[in-house]
Amino acid sequence: LIIDSFPVPVCQPIRNYRAKVFRGYANIGYKATKKIYFYGFKVHAIVSDDGYILDYVVTKASVHDARETVELMENTHPSNYYLLGDEGYLGKELHQQLKQMGYELWTPYRKNMTGAKKHNDHQLMAIRRTIESDFSLLTYYNAENNRARSLIGFQSRLEIAILAYNLAYCLERFN
C-alpha cells in the first residue's frame, strides 16, 4: 500500500488571507513541490500497489500528513501489512503506532540523514511513483480544481472525481 496527500486549493494564492469561502473549515497550508502557500484542503489517500484508491480523508490544509495515517489504516483494514510513504511520514511515534497495529511503514530518509544512500532503494521509489501518477490523473478529473462553494458540493465533486478515476482504473484493468 502507498500513502500520500495532495492539496486542493480553494482560491489563488494572492487571495489566501481574503478568502471567505469555507471560512472555519479550510485554512492555509504549504505545497512543498511548488514552494507556495495555498488556502484550502488536503486530501490524504491510501492507494493499492497497482493504483486503486482504497480510502481517503479530507482535512484542513495545515494538517500534517502523518496525523491521518492511523485513521486511514483503521478504516481500510488492508491485508497487506506494508505501507510505503514519503518523507512527510518520518517519525518514531507514527512508526510505533503502526507497528502496534501490525503494519510496517517504510519511508525514505531525507538526503541529510545518515545512511540515506543505502536506505533509499530506487525500486521502492519507483513504486511510490504509482501514487504520484494517480494524483496527476485525479487532476484530469478535476479533483484538485474543485470550484465548489459549499461543503456538500465540495464533497460530492471530490467523490465523483475519485469514483470516475476508480471506474476508469477498473475498466482499464479488466479489459
Where are these regions (language model features)?
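Structural motif
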Residues: 33-36, 149-158
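Catalytic-loop motifs flanking and including active-site residues across diverse enzymes
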Residues: 68, 130, 159-162
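Helix-centered, glycine/charged polyanion-binding patches within enzymatic domains
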Residues: 81-82, 87-152
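Short, solvent-exposed polar/charged micro-motifs at secondary-structure junctions
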Residues: 9-15, 116-118, 159
